[in-house]
């Protein structure tokens, strides 16, 4: 859809849906329209043909960063390549995101003694044929805890392991709480242990790293090394045979994969621009399409060569407010009480001033819904369904701004700051796709209606990689930003809201936040099955009310699949049932073309 027509539709909807004074718009402002339902597994039952190549498109409007290691990657697109093809995960999860015994290793937890034991099964090998051993299980902890580590996986949770803080500070050469029992067994001691350990939290890492291959690379140089970029040793179903940096990857089947050598010998992964992907799908160029923007669904949904699979994504988009900076020396987030966005009523007003349900209907064709919590609904027992969030209420927004002292002094339609000086908010938003520009203009227009002037930081939309570089670096040109989180199956708040987490991009921290998050990981969660859901609800009630990270939307993750593909399954926990990319077969020599 063209930008002009998107804006026209949106303006028309605003006229049709707006409410007069005194009407209870906020009562309906949280009511979500029904979303579309999708199958999670291909229906193709035809016989496979030998020698066909699986062609995968990754929709991205900028080059692939290309760091393919769980401890080192930062970009979600790299994470997708790892998850599907190059994984080093050794602990499987089920449909409830809880660790099972179906993976490379098993987990046994001793709550009373605050210990966990990881045991590698017999016959497990890396792609180079070397056995997966206890040292490989220990090495990721040594990497992320090292003082020279350049990644972002170290968090408040990591410090729960006995001796990790001393190791991180350089006061110890080993992590005292991690013990190699034998070549296949590792015992980890924790200062405290909570229910999150069963979903890969509490400082537990669910992946290994091939120490025999990586140990000679200084940890400070690991992120730049070809051993995590182009020449990998992995535990997953495929390995890299060749790569064009940023553009494409050629993969070959790993004969040592523990579930069996993949049925399709060769895979190609190509980065494809969002402007050209639907035409390529129609012409039968790709078999699987990852990370396709949801707004393109209306274009390809009727292609007769495509079957669209989908699942509710572990994802929420959000509005973030910059509250301070990350102090690298202290390793924690420092709130600036004088930050432009420091006033709670200002932040809440901006949240109440956005009609997200209206935006979802105009832009996303039933593939998203308004979010009220940082917990997506797919986490059934943890999702706080009664949490109201910020239903659209422009009158309440205006009242909050008045109370906070932001008033229009000169009658130009925009409010000045508390001192009567011109006030504007610099907004960071990502480029990519047809709706990126009209979407941010929608936000700017909505804030204009409550008297707040919003302008684009840098004067334009920001390319994906540069956007996160600026947000992570606390660029002073950014006051607010629109971003999204892929939520880990651990469902731990520490990674994105913790005092010590680099991923806490808002830089918000408070003693109350620390206390409530600690309860989410309390040892009580091990004995009381209702404790964690209740603790999560209490934390969410506080955190959402602070309006530092305002959830905007949940979405479906869509996987357009060419109809020659067989045995592709996207359901969560499908590996517990023995399913996975290694079983995918192709029933035609080339991808099928659409006749429509």
How would you name each of these model-derived features?
Residues 105-153, 280, 339-341:
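Aromatic- and charge-enriched surface segment that lines or borders ligand/interaction sites
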Residues 154-216:
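Surface-exposed binding/hinge segments that line
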Residues 245, 407-484, 557:
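Ligand/substrate-recognition segments at binding pockets and active sites
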Residues 255, 351-383, 435, 439-444, ...:
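Detector for C-terminal structural segments
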